[in-house]
């Protein structure tokens, strides 16, 4: 396949209108959309992740929307492999594809590739998650600091997913996680073009407030309540869900 294929990535903050723009462009170009919003992968997370509506999904073919369960073990490495396989297949008939979503790491995995890591036995991850759930974020932060100070100084220390990912690699290989991070860009059969959406802060905040109000009206509280038994899952440690879990437990007002 010659490198005359184009992937258009539409990026921007939550609530700015990425979905609507992606659908508008996809219709004009007669093409399909791939989501890289890691929260929208999960079929149990509906209201709180604002996926495209049923009518929007019918208007344009979407991929990676509600294709996984919160009980599946799924990470950016799995996504990269599945998405690149699909993209190569779609490019047999299409010259342009649309990538949209707010998860920058997942978008980067498609456009540039991510470092290769060994397959980790599920029991190691489960043990670390249990450790995090029982002892809290500070414990795994300190563990990472002791085992890989370089990555500790680079990672978002509030992102438990990334800390656990690093710790499982360290535990399985006996090597620092930072040693695996070569940041070497992978060869792709397509060119990537990025559209970053922006708007005035006040206007964006008003949109987000309206969006949250709509979620509440649609039954977000009920959706989160039905997922309460699974709040220990890393997938549910996300904005819009963890706040309700804290509310249910009397930890916030």
Which residues does each predicted region cover?
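Phosphate/pyrophosphate-binding catalytic cores of soluble transferases and nucleic-acid-acting enzymes
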Residues: 1-253
């Amino acid at each position: 396949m010659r490198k005359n294929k184009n992937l258009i990535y539409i990026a921007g903050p939550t609530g700015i209108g990425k979905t609507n723009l992606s659908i508008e462009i996809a219709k004009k170009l007669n093409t399909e959309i791939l989501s890289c919003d890691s929260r929208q992968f999960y079929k149990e997370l509906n209201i709180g992740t604002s996926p495209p509506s049923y009518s929007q999904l019918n208007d344009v073919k979407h991929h990676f929307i509600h294709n996984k369960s919160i009980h599946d073990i799924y990470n950016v490495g799995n996504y990269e492999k599945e998405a690149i396989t699909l993209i190569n297949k779609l490019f047999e008939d299409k010259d342009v594809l649309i990538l949209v979503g707010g998860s920058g790491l997942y978008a980067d995995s498609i456009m540039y590739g991510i470092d290769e890591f060994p397959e980790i036995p599920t029991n190691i991850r489960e043990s670390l998650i249990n450790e995090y759930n029982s002892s809290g974020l500070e414990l795994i932060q300190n563990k990472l600091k002791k085992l890989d100070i370089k990555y500790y100084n680079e990672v978002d220390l509030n992102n438990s997913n990334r800390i656990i990912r690093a710790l499982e690699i360290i535990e399985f290989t006996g090597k620092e996680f930072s040693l695996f991070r070569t940041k070497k860009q992978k060869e792709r059969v397509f060119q990537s073009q990025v559209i970053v959406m922006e708007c005035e802060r006040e206007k964006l905040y008003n949109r987000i407030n309206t969006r949250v109000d709509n979620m509440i009206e649609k039954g977000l509280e009920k959706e989160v309540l039905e997922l309460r038994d699974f709040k220990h899952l890393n997938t549910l440690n996300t904005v819009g869900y963890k706040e309700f879990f804290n509310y249910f437990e009397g930890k916030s007002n």
